Amino acid sequence: MERNTKAVIFNAIGILATVFILVSGPIVTPTVLYILIQVFGLLLIIWALIAIKVSKKHTRHALPEGYFLITKGPYEIVRHPVYAGFLLIMVSIVEIEFTFLRLVALLILCGAILMKILREEHTMTEEVHEYKEYKEKTKAIIPYLL
């Protein structure tokens, strides 16, 4: 199967899992902890997008001419802060009203995101020489762990 076809499939699976999680139960909670987790996840996403914008580069798989690796801001903490923030939000939403089906959807979403990460990192390792060193010193999604 072609790489682009795989990417479309993983994106579709991730979107379907996300939609299922969002429509299968409440997404808003009066619990302060879940609100804080969701806000933190959203702020992490915004911070990462600002870091990309400030560097005036984007993160498409086909790297633009003159691309350089972004290692400042949230990218000093994890290699994929947008995915990390999104997963924080989705985990907290599943926890609001935990069901087996929502857990399965969350695991499917995590698998789809993992496949996207592996694809992105393969491209980055091939095309950006300093990425291997960056990868060795910075965790993918969870600081100090993963």
What is the role of each PLM region?
Residues 72, 76-84:
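Histidine-centered phosphotransfer motif of kinases
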Residues 1-71, 88-146:
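Membrane-anchoring alpha-helices and their flanking helix-loop junctions
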